[in-house]
From Swiss-Prot:
It comes from Coxiella burnetii (strain Dugway 5J108-111). One of its GO terms (cellular component) is cytosol. HAMAP family: TrmD. Gene3D superfamilies: 3.40.1280.10, tRNA(m1g37)methyltransferase, domain 2. It is an enzyme of class 2 (transferase). This is tRNA (guanine-N(1)-)-methyltransferase.
Amino acid sequence: MKLIIGVITLFPQMFDALKSGVIGRALKQDRLTLSFWNPRDYATDPHRTVDDRPYGGGPGMVMKFEPLALALKAAKAQLGENTKVIHLTPQGKLLTQAIVREKIHASPLILLAGRYEGIDERLIEAEVDEEWSIGDYILSGGELPAMVLIDAMTRLLPGVLGHKDSASQDSFTAGLLDYPHYTRPEKIADRPVPSVLLSGDHEAISRWRLKQSLGRTWQRRQDLIKRRSLSENEQRLLDEFFEESS
């Protein structure tokens, strides 16, 4: 068995750390192949811009659709058009050893490592097959989670270790998953930015974001909702989310 993984990242040099230890051994044995695509190489403006301000306001920047889409296109041209794309994000399903054991047989895989406040939601809708999280905490980007996943999968390759060493992590904190992010352009194909984010009504934007966070958490991490004592307003927003999604 050989593991083939492509990574979309603004910082491919971070992955030099994988040349040591178990993963380094797998690379030398040709049991693991890693390839990298930097979205900045696919930016079309003179400044090689990969991020922009978020619609609806708020802190930070959001990674733009086009450079990521072009990087993914290049990755799929090399690895195969049907290669699954995995986005590493706190909004994803919790990565477990069972998932690692399952996905090692899904190689090749493309891992998408975001930065800043997140990735334009329309890129996720159009290109991402699954979203995974390594835990309920925030990191500066998706590179470390991608390395965690690569490490966990590589350890299961026959012959890389003297034996298969499984581990589990069950330390969580209560909270809600993030709401969707959008940045320019205002419309991509048939996917427009939600109109409320263009309204300039900050109260309505805050309400929409909380509703999306509650709904997304219920859909993906009900355990977090069950730990949380919802206020009357939060319960009302969650009910609205169900009605709008039905």
